[in-house]
Amino acid sequence: MSETILKRTYLTSEQKTQKPSSLIPPQTYHAQLAHRIHYSPQFENGRVKNEMPNVPSPQSFWQVCWSYLGGRTPLSPNEHLPHSPIQPTQFAKRSESMRLTWLGHSTMLVEVDGIRILTDPVFDYASPFIAKAWFERNIPNTHARDCLPIPEIIVISHDHYDHLEASTIRFYADKPVTFYVPLGGGKHLIKWGVCADNIVEFDWWDSVHYAGIELICTPANHNSGRTYFDKNATLWASWVIKGKEETLYFSGDSAYDSHFSEIAQRCGPIDIACLEVAADVKGQGYPVENWGHMQAHHTVQAFHDLNAKKL
């Protein structure tokens, strides 16, 4: 990672309490980004090279979409789902050890060595505006955002709607937060009001130290894009968060691949592995790994490949 990019992560305590103001001209930011994408081994002709699985399927993509959206009933659970509403008082004291609070889907508040990190924050609808009616939350979570403490860092795995939410980014845009995103993802944040000075873009295996902890951007096997026209224009990633005593792995979205073993070799030992498992598309016959996800047995194998202590 270039020196100019790294410098933006080393903020003083005084700077962390000030409202962000951009010091990097937009043209400079975009020029730096274009340069890094051009020389990144993950990109080719401005797009991320995609090597997802291609498992034979008895149904086409569109057949699965139709049967999944139209044939699976009910889309909402028949029974009440147990949940515990967030209370502001539970975060009154910072946790010096590793503490995780799962907030739904891939959103977690990670507390390590007194630092708070929010992963893939999504609190409203995990879908484009036009599809909100199909993808309402079974348990509303919007108010959780207001109850949480402001994190020092927000980590993004990729730019799909269920991992990168415009309304939540706008909520944090004027807060003293540093955003860590895979290469190319910062353009979305700038559009939603985040200052370029508060965005750090990572290629795979880039790392940074922040107040005694280390964050490493690690590979994943997925895809990216928020429209048909920007498919794979930004990088996707997983993340390793190393504290003084414990190390956490956050997978984001990923199909099963050899990168889990490589991450264990280069970043281990890993204490806690937070791994995705795809929704069970019962009877639909389409392998979720072709969409860049893991079935349950893949998740278990990834856990073993990581040689992690807890899942």
Stretches found by the model and what they are:
Residues 131-180, 268-274:
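Active-site metal-binding motif and surrounding structural segment of the metallo-beta-lactamase
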Residues 1-145, 181-252, 271-272, 277-278:
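Metallo-beta-lactamase
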Residues 23-24, 39, 43-46, 50, ...:
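Cap/insert and terminal regions of metallo-dependent hydrolase folds
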Residues 110, 120, 158, 179, ...:
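Divalent metal-coordination and catalytic microenvironments
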Residues 107-113, 209-270, 290, 294:
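Catalytic core of the metallo-beta-lactamase
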Residues 123-140, 223-230, 282-293:
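Acidic/histidine-rich helix-loop elements
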Residues 160, 205, 221, 255, ...:
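Catalytic metal-binding/acid-base residues of hydrolase active sites
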